[in-house]
């Protein structure tokens, strides 16, 4: 934010979808759903494919870019139509050979840890 980059943060909606809003100042983040800081309603909404990079949270990631998240499927639903590059961040000790996955689970394209960058899927 200090460098003037356009950064969009997620908002979790009651219908279990996610939207993103541009944040220009940390004071625009307010504690909301699940106790997570989200942009306030004054922030401009960002169209889903107006950005090229998505950082995806996860508890653990596997070699194929699948993850265990927090169980609501927000990011899996969003990733199903996202056209940019998705990145998972985790410590190497949280990278497993394989994690359980369901039919709606989506993988990230790249996993980054303190030990390196792993391109696990060809970017879309």
Feature-to-residue mapping (PLM):
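N-terminal active-site beta-alpha-beta segment that forms phosphate/nucleotide-binding
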Residues: 1-53
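Short linear motifs at secondary-structure transitions and domain/linker junctions
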Residues: 10-12, 28-35, 61-67, 85-89
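Surface-exposed, charge/polar-rich loops and edge strands
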Residues: 49-54, 62-66, 76-124
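Short, well-ordered strand-loop elements centered on a beta-strand within folded domains, enriched
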Residues: 15-21, 66-68, 117
């Amino acid at each position: 934010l200090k460098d003037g980059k356009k950064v969009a943060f997620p908002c979790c909606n009651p219908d279990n979808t996610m939207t993103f809003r541009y944040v220009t100042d940390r004071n625009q983040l307010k504690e909301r759903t699940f106790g997570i800081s989200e942009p306030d309603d004054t922030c401009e909404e960002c169209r889903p494919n107006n950005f090229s990079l998505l950082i995806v949270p996860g508890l653990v990631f596997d070699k194929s870019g699948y993850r265990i998240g927090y169980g609501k499927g927000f990011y899996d639903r969003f990733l199903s139509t996202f056209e940019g590059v998705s990145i998972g961040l985790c410590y190497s000790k949280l990278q497993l050979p394989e994690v359980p996955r369901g039919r709606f689970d989506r993988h990230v394209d790249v996993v980054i840890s303190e030990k390196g960058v792993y391109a696990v899927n060809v970017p879309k």
